[in-house]
């Protein structure tokens, strides 16, 4: 039996309003629990359109057929009109998710974090995280115990900024296994549970055809020598490609693969490491990557 952490990122208003309810229904039918990370502030995702001037981002949008994948309402959100606030407008949906699944913070403003957090000072970052946590806690009526940085934009500054919130774990980076990042003080910080597997948009049209993706991913899962963690998006697997996700769950069950919330992957002593800026194939720009202590 292979155990895989299932992380669901919710980036947008539409993903929350339409994608999450569909995913909740699918997961309920398959008796699966997951970790769901919500963006709760303004939906300004359309402001990423300026990145089309960057060849790597333009190629990603073209090969993933972004207009069909996400819809124009997502691609233009927050451009010609102010971005709608996501959290309180979809409070009932978020509360329903929290009844059955582990719920954490993705971001206050997903676009702002992904585009600008790498240049923020520590206090700006702390204030942004606090605003998101406070909003999500108001919605579900209980403390938030986990978070996942938008776009995996995380480095030592993010690790230090989140430490003061005393969360159970964060999932801010890409890597191979859970670990404890070293703080500037030399002490181990809050556990990190990295995502180990590629997302749909990172490989479709580059390494894999859409119809071959599930078989390709299951092969990666079964060969994973670390602690496999897979991320889906409410805007993708909860909308245009929900049938592909259902097929993945059915095929995974046949292969003895089970999915679980990320917290179930925490156990015993964790190795030490760091979160450093790096790059991965299929994703434009830098992102947080696990570095085992003592390695370079």
UniProtKB/Swiss-Prot annotation:
It is an enzyme of class 3 (hydrolase). Residues 2-260 form the NodB homology domain. Coiled coil: none annotated. Keywords: Antibiotic resistance, Hydrolase, Lipid A biosynthesis, Lipid biosynthesis, Lipid metabolism, Lipopolysaccharide biosynthesis. It comes from the Bacteria. Transmembrane segments: none annotated. InterPro entries: ArnD (IPR023557), Glyco_hydro/deAcase_b/a-brl (IPR011330), NODB_dom (IPR002509), Polysacc_deacetylase_ArnD (IPR050248). GO terms for molecular function: hydrolase activity, acting on carbon-nitrogen (but not peptide) bonds, in linear amides. It holds the Pfam family Polysacc_deac_1. PROSITE patterns: NODB. GO terms for biological process: 4-amino-4-deoxy-alpha-L-arabinopyranosyl undecaprenyl phosphate biosynthetic process; lipid A biosynthetic process; lipopolysaccharide biosynthetic process; response to antibiotic. Its EC number is 3.5.1.n3. GO terms for cellular component: membrane. Pathway: Glycolipid biosynthesis; 4-amino-4-deoxy-alpha-L-arabinose undecaprenyl phosphate biosynthesis; 4-amino-4-deoxy-alpha-L-arabinose undecaprenyl phosphate from UDP-4-deoxy-4-formamido-beta-L-arabinose and undecaprenyl phosphate: step 2/2; Bacterial outer membrane biogenesis; lipopolysaccharide biosynthesis. Gene3D superfamilies: Glycoside hydrolase/deacetylase. CDD domains: CE4_ArnD. It catalyses: 4-deoxy-4-formamido-alpha-L-arabinopyranosyl di-trans,octa-cis-undecaprenyl phosphate + H2O = 4-amino-4-deoxy-alpha-L-arabinopyranosyl di-trans,octa-cis-undecaprenyl phosphate + formate. The keyword Lipid biosynthesis applies. HAMAP family: ArnD. Belongs to the polysaccharide deacetylase family. ArnD deformylase subfamily. Catalyzes the deformylation of 4-deoxy-4-formamido-L-arabinose-phosphoundecaprenol to 4-amino-4-deoxy-L-arabinose-phosphoundecaprenol. The modified arabinose is attached to lipid A and is required for resistance to polymyxin and cationic antimicrobial peptides. This is Probable 4-deoxy-4-formamido-L-arabinose-phosphoundecaprenol deformylase ArnD. It comes from Escherichia coli (strain SMS-3-5 / SECEC).
């Amino acid at each position: 039996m292979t155990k895989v952490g299932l992380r669901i990122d919710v980036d947008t208003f539409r993903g929350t309003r339409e994608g999450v309810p569909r995913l909740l229904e699918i997961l309920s039918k398959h008796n699966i629990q997951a970790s769901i990370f919500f963006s709760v502030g303004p939906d300004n995702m359309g402001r990423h359109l300026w990145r089309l001037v960057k060849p790597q981002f333009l190629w990603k949008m073209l090969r993933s057929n972004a207009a069909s994948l996400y819809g124009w309402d997502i691609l233009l959100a927050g451009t010609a009109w102010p971005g709608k606030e996501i959290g309180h407008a979809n409070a009932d949906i978020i509360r329903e998710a929290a009844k059955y699944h582990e719920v954490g913070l993705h971001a206050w403003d997903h676009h702002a974090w992904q585009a600008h957090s790498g240049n923020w000072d520590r206090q700006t970052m702390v204030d942004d995280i606090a605003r998101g946590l406070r909003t999500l806690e108001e919605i579900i009526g209980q403390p938030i115990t986990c978070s996942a940085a938008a776009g995996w934009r995380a480095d030592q500054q993010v690790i230090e900024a989140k430490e003061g919130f005393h969360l159970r774990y964060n999932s801010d980076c890409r890597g191979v296994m859970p670990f404890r990042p070293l703080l500037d003080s030399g002490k181990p910080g809050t556990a990190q549970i990295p995502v180990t597997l590629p997302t749909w948009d990172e490989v479709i049209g580059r390494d894999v055809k859409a119809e071959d993706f599930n078989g390709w991913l299951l092969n990666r899962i079964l060969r994973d020598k670390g602690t496999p963690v897979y991320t889906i998006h409410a805007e993708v697997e909860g909308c245009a490609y929900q049938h592909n996700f259902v097929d993945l769950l059915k095929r995974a069950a046949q292969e003895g693969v089970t999915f679980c919330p990320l917290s179930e992957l925490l156990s015993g002593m964790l190795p030490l490491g760091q979160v450093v800026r790096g790059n991965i194939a299929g994703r434009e720009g830098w992102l947080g990557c696990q570095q085992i202590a003592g390695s370079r």
